[in-house]
């Protein structure tokens, strides 16, 4: 293994004791079989259950591949940004973000990885099976981004995306540290940036393996309203 891997997998984790063993077992097996040199960075975001203890057990078993850190709770978006910034700072060519609830299925990773040379940003295009409310929320978000921001993002909030760190570095400094729904903001900034090649991979998106969403639907809607206010302040000046 090289000191600097080819891929950093960023996985925010919050109260996922019901799913984390299943998720790590599947993802480590898939990544091992892919042939890429990777590290999986699990950022434990102040869980109140025994998630961190389970992560530490996994790290003891796979120290060469799994990195674990814990911190006070700051939310999913800020956890993702922390991982992206670390990938850029370490000079790692690619960063993959997945979630720890079992909805990001490892079986689709190979389809993403094949596109990395011809696309700078690759999003999962979800065939959602986790409820009509989430389906409507995704559709409304895409429409609102088209109308209000003038960008078409396939699935701006999808927790399954492969990005080149070179592309991320071009826009990361313009994404505020405390912004709500940080993945949405990053997707918008990347879409606005000239020269970045975008792609998508159709993915199944099953119900959560266990636990509860870190952002319930009513809070997601409130955050969506807030992020459009924040995006307005991030628009390029004429």
Regions found by a protein language model. Name each.
Residues 16-31:
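Short, well-formed alpha-helical segments that are part of the catalytic scaffolds
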Residues 92-103:
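Short beta-strand-to-loop acidic/aromatic patch adjacent to the donor-nucleotide binding site
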